Amino acid sequence: VDKPDYRPRPRPPNM
């Protein structure tokens, strides 16, 4: 089972 490359998600806007 090959794991997909996880890309760093952009931080959500702090509201």
From Swiss-Prot:
Keyword Cell inner membrane part of the UniProt annotation: no
Biological-process GO terms, alphabetical: defense response to Gram-negative bacterium; innate immune response
Conditions for induction: By bacterial infection.
UniProt entry keywords in alphabetical sequence: Antibiotic, Antimicrobial, Immunity, Innate immunity
Keyword Phosphoprotein among record annotations: no
One of the record's GO cellular component terms: extracellular region
Function: Antibacterial peptide active against Gram-negative bacteria.
Name used for this protein in its record: Metalnikowin-1
Species the sequence originates in: Palomena prasina (Green shield bug)
